[in-house]
Amino acid sequence: MPCELCPRRCRADRASGAVGFCQAGALPRVFRWGPHFGEEPPLVGEHGSGCVFFSRCTMKCLYCQNSPWSWGGEGRDMSVTELTGIFRDLACKDRVENWNLVSPTPYLPYIRETAHTLAAEGIRLPFVWNSSGYERVETLEEYADLCDWALFDLRYSRNETALKASAAPGYVETSRAAAKWAWERDRRRLIVRILVLPGHADEAIESLAWLATELSNEVPVSLMSQYTPAYKGCETPPFDRGVTEEEYESVTEAAADFGFENGWTQGFGAADPKLAFLGENMSAAHGTVS
């Protein structure tokens, strides 16, 4: 069946071996999985968030810190039975608080099949849809059963930046529509992440302004200072440097000015704040693919 899961709507017949923009194939590919304690507090609880890092991505961020698996496709193809085993172990052995689907969009049909199998066994946990925000509302509607929590980015407020930095046409309208869908569906279960990018703090502020005006300043926001130059960003100004303290403070001050009271900031200048949300800082006891 032609794939139209993401906004690109490539219509690649993946079951027959064709691939689209994301290069995802006919089977789910996973890079790493396990309990993760670096997510936002409501998702972590006592036993951590059960993160499953899927390979491939619907965007191509030139500064991607996860490029080995998002761009390069590192990971292992697995059957739905194997994928179900991962989710079962996370729930029953690790006793995680939720199943955290990191960049799941190309593999949603397989994840749903896994969920149905586990539900038949009496195994149920909330799903976290952990995404860049570059999602079709039609796909969100179709797979809403996999979105108990929406952990969505608002990365850009200008499409020209999104196209240059992430090869994501129409990102602004698309990500805002996704955030609006999640907010209207369940106001208790949306967290918006805003990664402050070097030279683009004004876009983070514009995203906050849109949230406050079009949704609500009650939306929980996670303001992230962790940007670190990586991959092609190391050769592409202004992405070849970190965020300055002045840039980050301008965003946190704007959040206060807009009346946001729910959410989190990252300590600027703390020891390795950049690691707080990265998969490579997660315990790899049973999730590393060599």
Regions found by a protein language model. Give the residues of each.
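Auxiliary Fe-S-binding modules of radical SAM enzymes
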Residues: 1-18, 187-189, 194-290
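N-terminal [4Fe-4S]-dependent radical SAM core
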Residues: 2-58, 62, 66-71, 279, ...
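Short Fe-S-cluster ligation motifs
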Residues: 30-50, 85-104, 265
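Residue-level marker of alpha-helix boundaries and capping positions
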Residues: 55, 77, 130, 241-242
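Glycine-rich active-site/cofactor-binding loop and its immediate structural neighborhood
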Residues: 55, 60-97
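Positions that flank functional sites
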Residues: 79, 106, 270-271
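Conserved AdoMet/S-adenosylmethionine-binding subsite of the radical SAM
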Residues: 84-238
